[in-house]
């Protein structure tokens, strides 16, 4: 679900609320061009969403920014076959397009909001997926029962869902 919100973030891409033993998790993501906007974005989120302001862990987040340029490479692969008929025509040339992303000036960071290790897990997710210019935030409403390590699985699951909804992941 996408929600219109405010001045800095026009649309939040939100995951569904995941519930486990009365704890609730929800992730949101938005495009990010400048890390200096993060405090204002977080403030805007809590002001415009009263349920977030009541969460036990409002802002577990990670972000990455970079100057990204897409380069289109045309690769030619030759299929070598033993018969002369294939060598006489161009059927052995397979042209495929590969888009490579070449980031420059990468900046990144994360915050746990009291959920030790959560921000780093989110940042690792962004790094492994090679995602740039995004802010991903996970909110947790503690339900009274410790979840152990499964809380990290829930945080990652919600983050992946919102990144897919936002078009940052296929």
Swiss-Prot record:
SUPFAM superfamilies: Ribosomal protein S5 domain 2-like. PROSITE patterns: UPF0029. InterPro entries: Impact, Impact_N, Impact_N_sf, Ribosomal_Su5_D2-typ_SF, UPF0029_Impact_CS. It holds the Pfam family UPF0029. It comes from the Eukaryota. GO terms for cellular component: cytoplasm. Residues 79-98 are annotated as: Disordered. PANTHER family: IMPACT FAMILY MEMBER YDL177C, IMPACT-RELATED. Present with 907 molecules/cell in log phase SD medium. This is IMPACT family member YDL177C. It comes from Saccharomyces cerevisiae (strain ATCC 204508 / S288c).
């Amino acid at each position: 679900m996408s929600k219109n919100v405010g001045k800095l973030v026009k649309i939040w891409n939100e995951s569904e609320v995941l519930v486990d033993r009365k704890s609730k998790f929800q992730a949101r993501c938005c495009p990010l061009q400048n890390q200096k906007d993060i405090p204002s974005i977080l403030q805007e989120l809590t002001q415009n969403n009263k349920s977030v302001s009541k969460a036990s862990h409002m802002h577990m987040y990670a972000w990455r920014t970079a100057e990204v340029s897409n380069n289109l490479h045309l690769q030619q692969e030759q299929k070598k076959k033993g018969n002369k008929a294939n060598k006489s025509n161009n059927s052995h040339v397979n042209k495929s397009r590969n888009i490579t992303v070449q980031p420059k000036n990468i900046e990144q960071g994360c915050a746990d909001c009291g959920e030790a290790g959560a921000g780093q897990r989110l940042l690792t997710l962004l790094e492994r997926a090679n995602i740039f210019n995004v802010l991903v935030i996970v909110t947790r409403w503690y339900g009274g029962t410790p979840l152990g390590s499964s809380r990290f699985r829930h945080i990652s699951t919600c983050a992946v869902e919102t990144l897919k909804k936002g078009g940052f992941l296929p």
